[in-house]
Design a protein with these regions (language model features):
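Cytochrome P450
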Residues: 1-173
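Short internal beta-strands
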Residues: 19-20, 249, 312
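Short glycine/proline-enriched turns and hinge-like loops at secondary-structure junctions
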Residues: 46, 59, 77-81, 199-201, ...
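Short, surface-exposed secondary-structure boundary micro-motifs
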Residues: 70, 228, 278-279
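Short, compositionally biased
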Residues: 78-88, 237-246, 285-298
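Ferredoxin-reductase
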Residues: 173-272, 289
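FNR/FR-type flavoprotein reductase catalytic core
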Residues: 261-312
């Protein structure tokens, strides 16, 4: 079920499928993202062993519960843009499809590896595979497990890559056991613009190299910039609704450890660097009746984005 769900998800989101065909190193995190958005284990039934209260709801002893953990995989408080399939999401592995704590799936790493091998084999040998158009999907009649009863695909054997290069049959990619390494999950971006905004302040405007939309972000979000052996976190600013670019402003610290100096002095317009995120550790509660925003020093950047959001 998990593998069928993954193929259905990736072939439905064609850009994601093409991304792992071009860069198979994305496959491990693609597996985690598919388990998040279309996991094969969606709910468990439980019986309360004692009177309790959860989220303000009283649950009596003996009460029968249907715990739909798949809903947590779309919690916007934890996952940025939860409805989107994002192969570069750096916390995809925090899905609950394998459960959590003492009762999590003992075979999760075997399952991960099986899914990776399936995807690697198909992307290497049948990158042109497509879902048959017009089909409808019937799912298992089950409250706990979810997967399509059947998945119809099609391809043209004349386009199989091994016809032009038989050597690819002997070049499967190997994967490490376990969850993907978080720090390896970065996307390439090009520095579209570089601006001197003041003494020691540099604004970078970042875009996808192929002009594809970048992830949406919420007020208070940051990204990790990776270049020149440095990895630094910078708050996002600029126009949130413009998904063609992401913007950061960097303060050059002359006496720092070298990260800000590198991004301010060595990075130029036209350069390609890497980025992780966005991620929000300072989420704005827009339901509050009023807000008082206080910041000093580096904290002013996310606060400005929050002020812009509240003003809008």
């Amino acid at each position: 079920n998990a593998t069928a769900n993954a193929f259905m998800t990736l072939l439905t989101h064609r850009e994601a499928w093409e991304a792992i065909c071009e860069n198979p190193a994305l496959i491990p995190n693609a597996v985690e993202e598919c388990l998040r958005v279309a996991g094969s284990i969606i709910a468990w039934r439980r019986i309360a062993t004692a009177d309790t209260t959860v989220g303000g709801v009283a649950i009596p002893k003996g009460g029968k519960l249907l715990i739909v953990q798949a809903s947590a995989n779309f919690d916007a408080r934890h996952f940025e843009n939860p409805q989107e399939v994002d192969l570069y999401r750096d916390n995809s592995v925090e899905h609950l499809t394998f459960g959590y704590g003492a009762h999590q799936c003992m075979g999760k790493n075997i399952g991960r590896m099986e899914m990776r091998v399936f995807l690697e084999e198909f992307t290497r040998r049948l990158p042109h595979i497509r879902l048959v158009e017009g089909q409808s999907f019937d799912f298992l009649l089950n409250t706990s497990f979810r997967g399509p009863a059947e998945l119809w695909v099609e391809w043209d054997p004349r386009r199989n890559p091994e016809r032009a290069n038989p050597a690819i049959l002997d070049k499967p990619l190997s994967f490490k056991i376990g969850a993907p390494v978080k720090d390896d999950i970065t996307r390439a971006v090009v520095v579209r613009e570089r601006h001197e905004e003041g003494e020691g302040l540099v604004r970078l405007v970042l875009a996808d190299p192929r002009g594809r939309p970048l992830p949406a972000w919420s007020a208070g979000s940051h990204v990790d910039l990776v270049a020149g052996g440095f990895r630094r976190k910078y708050s996002l600013c600029g126009i949130r609704d413009d998904r063609s670019v992401l913007e950061v402003v960097i303060l050059r610290e002359a006496d720092g450890r070298g990260g800000s100096r590198h991004f301010c002095d060595a990075v130029a317009a036209g350069d390609t660097i890497h980025l992780a995120g966005p991620k929000n550790l300072f989420r704005l509660d827009e339901s509050a009746p009023r807000h008082v925003l206080i910041a000093g020093g580096i904290g002013i950047t996310p606060i400005l984005a929050m002020a812009d959001r509240l003003k809008a």
